[in-house]
Amino acid sequence: MTSPSDVMIDIDQLWSIFGQGEQAFAVHQDLNLQVHRGEMLSIVGGSGTGQTVVLRPSLGLLQPGKGRVTTLGRPAAELCRAGASARVGMLFQHGALYSAFSVLDNIAFALREQGGLPDAVVRQAAMIKLQMVGLKPEHASRNPADLSGGMIKRVALARALIMDPPLLLLDEPTAGLDPTSSDEFCALLRQLQADLGLTVVMVTHDLDTLFALSSRVAVLAEKRVLVSGTAQEVAQFDHPFTTTFFQGERGRRAMAPAPSATPLAAPASA
């Protein structure tokens, strides 16, 4: 049985409603989902199922039309209060860096906004996070326009971690990255999750990322969580979306075991 203290996010009977009156429509109806301490949960679903929308009430950015959302043991709406949001890190799909700020100032932004710390301490903390995500000290003075897509992701990740949050939310973390950069970013996320004891919730459409990172997968369909379990378990669930998503060519390729290296033949004797 899961202890209440081990439930990082508790979504209970959530209705996500947009519009008003006759124009109102529900993206989610009676959606239930719990996120447990230490797991890496991926949320997947077809077009229009509102995967990213699920993250918004968890951050207190969207008031549920109905239902209840608790994050880190308190009503999620309270995260909008001063200081409370520092306990949840958010990595947006395209990084969302401030173009007029240097890399260092982007990373340090939330810490500076909180106030109360000498600038030297803020800069040191930002430099630690910069190197934690695999960037070099000389990158600190660069502007976002001078960075590659992979570097932007790393800076955004460092910014999300600057307040040492126990909970990290990721929106399409490997979108726009080439396969090598995607693999490297996944390896970085795995290492940070292990080193920092993070709980991670991720929205992704990338099957390679899903299989590389997820300890559990929740599938959204029919305005609710249709099924959750390991990637291998949900891949076998009988539903049109899971069949198309997991059993198509991309899914089969992502689930295929990595080929073992062929040993080199011993050199022939002279």
Regions found by a protein language model. Give the residues of each.
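Helix-to-loop junction immediately C-terminal to a conserved catalytic motif
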Residues: 59
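ABC ATPase NBD coupling module
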Residues: 75-89, 113, 120, 234-237
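Conserved ABC ATPase "signature" region
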Residues: 120-138
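Conserved ABC ATPase signature
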Residues: 143-147, 151
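Conserved catalytic motifs of ABC-family nucleotide-binding domains
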Residues: 164
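Catalytic Walker B motif of ABC-type/P-loop ATPase nucleotide-binding domains
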Residues: 168-171
